[in-house]
C-alpha cells in the first residue's frame, strides 16, 4: 500500500508541474488519487493523461494540412479588416476574418433539414458530411441516407463521417445503401475499445459542405430527437446556420483535416494522398460576394494548440457593453468564464443565460444548476426552458453572434473537437437576440436566492457535482 501511495504522489506531482490543465480539474484528480489510490492513477492514465492525446496528435495528419491550406487561403483572399474585438483572436487562431458571407439562422430541426435537403438536391460535384450523431436507423437519418445515395448514383462524390460514441448502436452496415451507391462512410475511432479509451476526445463537430459553396454547422445532429420526436425531451430547441461565402472554404478545410485523420486510420480502404488531392480541389473561394457579413471560423480540440473558442468567448464577454445572451445545454465553463460573466453583469451589462428545464444527463444538470447559483447571487439572470435547450449560441450588443457545436463547458472548450462560427453583422445579431427573447416566453426565471429554497440533500448533491464539474 505504501508503494501505491508513493506512486500516487509521483503522478500528482507530475500533474501539478507538467500538465497544462485547469486548476479545478487538477484538484479533482488529486482528491481521486487520495481517496481511490488503486484505480485513480489507472483512470487518469486512460482518460486524462497526455499519453492518449499524444497518440491522437501523432495520427492527426490533417492538422498540418489545415495549417498549410489556411495560410494559402489567407494569401489568396483580400483580407477584410477584422473588428477590434477579435483582431487578437484572428492573429492567434491564424484563421482570417472574411467579410463576403451570407449567414442564415435556422432555429429548429425542421427548418435546418428542409433547407439542407433543398441544397443537397442541387449538388453536382461533392457532398461532405460530418456529424457527432448520425442515426440511419431513424426516420430523418434514413431520409438523408437515401438522398445521399441518390446523389452518389448521379456521380456526386459523397463522404460521410460520424463519431461512434454519438450512437454506439449504429453500425457500418446501417449505411449500406449509401456505400453500395458509391458513397464513402467512415467512423471516428470505430472500435468500442478505442471509443471508450478516447472517451474524452470526441469528434463533436457538425458540418455539411456542398460543392464547396454552401455549408451548414451548429448544434443539430441527425436523429429524430432533434426534430422534437423524443417525448421525454420535448420541445427541443436547437440552432444551426447556413453559410455561403469565403467562410465556406475554411469549413471545407476543417472537414478535410478530420477526413484525412480517419483515412490514416483506415489505409486498407483509402489512398490518403489521393483523398487529400481530391479534397484540395474542393477548397474554393467564391467568384462573387455572397453577402456582406463578417465571419471567422474557429475550431478547437486536441488538434489545436490553444482553446480558441473559449478564448474568443472570453474576449466577446469582456467587450460586451449593453447585453449578453447565452444559450447552452450545459453551464460548466470553469471559474474564469464564470467570473467574467459576473464582472460583465456588475459592469452594467444585461447578462442572461438560457439552460434546459429538462435534463438529458442528470449529473451534468446538477453541475449546471450548481454553477448557476453564484451567478444568480451576483445578478446574472438565468432561465430554464420548458423543454430541452441544445442550442449553443452567444449574442452581444446587436453586433456579434456565435453559433457552433461547443457547449459552454470545459469538455467542449478544452477536450472535444469543436467548431464555431463568429458572425459580425447587426441584422444577424438582432435575429439571434429576438430568437433568444422569444425563447424566454417558454422559460422560467430562476430566483436569485434559489439555493436557499432547495433542500439540504439537493444542495449537497449540486455541490458535489460542481466540485467534479471540471472532469465532466
What are these regions (language model features)?
Residues 1-311, 315, 319, 359, ...:
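N-terminal localization/anchoring segments of enzymes in phospholipid and broader phosphate metabolism
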Residues 163, 329-330, 364:
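Glycine- and other small-residue-rich loops at beta-strand/loop junctions that grip anionic moieties
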Residues 239, 327-328:
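A short, conserved beta-strand element enriched in hydrophobic/aromatic residues
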Residues 323:
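Phosphate-/nucleic-acid-contacting segments
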Residues 330-351, 356, 361:
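Helical hairpin unit composed of two closely spaced alpha helices linked by a short loop
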Residues 340-343, 370, 437:
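Short, solvent-exposed amphipathic alpha-helical segments in soluble enzyme
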Residues 349-409:
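C-terminal structural cap/anchor segments
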Amino acid at each position: 500500500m505504501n508503494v501505491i501511495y508513493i506512486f500516487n504522489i509521483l503522478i500528482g506531482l507530475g500533474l501539478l508541474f507538467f500538465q497544462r490543465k485547469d486548476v479545478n480539474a487538477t484538484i479533482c484528480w488529486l482528491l481521486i488519487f487520495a481517496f481511490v489510490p488503486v484505480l485513480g492513477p489507472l483512470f487518469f492514465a486512460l482518460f486524462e493523461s497526455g499519453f492518449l492525446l499524444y497518440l491522437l496528435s501523432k495520427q492527426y495528419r490533417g492538422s498540418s494540412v489545415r495549417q498549410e491550406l489556411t495560410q494559402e487561403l489567407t494569401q489568396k483572399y483580400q483580407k477584410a479588416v477584422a473588428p477590434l474585438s477579435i483582431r487578437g483572436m484572428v492573429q492567434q487562431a491564424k484563421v482570417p476574418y472574411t467579410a463576403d458571407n451570407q449567414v442564415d439562422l435556422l432555429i429548429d430541426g425542421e427548418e435546418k433539414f428542409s433547407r439542407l435537403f433543398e441544397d443537397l438536391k442541387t449538388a453536382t460535384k461533392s457532398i461532405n458530411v460530418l456529424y457527432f450523431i448520425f442515426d440511419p436507423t431513424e426516420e430523418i437519418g434514413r431520409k438523408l441516407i437515401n438522398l445521399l445515395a441518390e446523389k452518389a448514383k448521379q456521380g456526386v462524390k459523397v463522404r460521410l463521417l460520424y463519431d461512434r460514441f454519438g450512437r454506439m448502436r449504429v453500425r457500418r452496415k446501417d449505411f449500406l445503401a449509401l456505400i453500395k451507391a458509391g458513397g464513402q462512410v467512415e467512423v471516428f475511432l470505430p472500435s468500442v475499445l478505442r471509443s471508450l479509451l478516447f472517451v474524452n476526445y470526441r469528434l463533436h463537430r457538425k458540418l455539411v459542405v456542398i460543392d464547396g459553396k454552401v455549408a451548414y454547422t451548429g448544434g443539430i445532429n441527425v436523429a429524430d430527437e432533434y426534430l422534437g420526436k423524443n417525448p421525454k425531451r420535448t420541445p427541443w430547441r436547437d440552432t444551426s446556420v447556413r453559410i455561403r461565402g469565403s467562410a465556406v472554404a475554411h469549413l471545407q478545410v476543417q472537414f478535410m483535416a478530420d477526413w484525412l485523420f480517419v483515412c490514416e486510420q483506415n489505409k486498407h480502404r483509402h489512398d490518403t494522398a489521393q483523398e487529400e488531392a481530391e479534397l484540395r480541389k474542393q477548397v474554393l473561394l467564391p467568384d462573387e460576394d455572397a453577402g456582406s457579413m463578417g465571419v471567422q471560423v474557429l475550431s478547437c480540440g486536441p488538434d489545436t494548440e490553444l482553446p480558441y473558442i473559449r478564448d474568443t468567448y472570453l474576449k466577446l464577454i469582456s467587450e460586451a457593453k449593453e447585453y449578453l445572451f447565452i444559450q447552452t445545454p450545459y453551464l460548466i465553463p470553469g471559474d474564469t468564464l464564470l467570473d467574467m460573466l459576473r464582472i460583465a453583469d456588475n459592469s452594467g451589462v444585461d447578462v442572461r443565460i438560457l439552460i434546459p428545464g429538462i435534463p438529458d444527463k442528470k449529473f451534468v444538470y446538477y453541475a449546471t444548476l450548481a454553477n448557476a447559483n453564484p451567478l444568480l447571487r451576483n445578478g446574472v439572470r438565468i432561465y430554464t426552458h420548458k423543454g430541452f435547450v441544445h442550442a449553443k449560441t452567444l449574442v452581444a450588443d446587436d453586433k456579434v453572434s456565435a453559433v457552433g457545436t461547443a457547449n459552454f463547458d470545459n469538455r467542449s472548450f478544452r477536450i472535444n473537437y469543436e467548431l464555431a462560427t463568429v458572425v459580425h453583422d447587426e441584422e444577424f445579431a438582432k435575429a439571434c437576440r429576438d430568437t433568444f427573447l422569444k425563447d424566454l416566453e417558454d422559460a422560467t426565471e430562476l430566483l436569485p436566492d434559489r439555493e436557499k429554497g432547495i433542500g439540504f440533500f439537493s444542495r449537497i448533491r449540486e455541490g458535489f457535482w460542481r466540485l467534479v464539474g471540471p472532469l465532466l
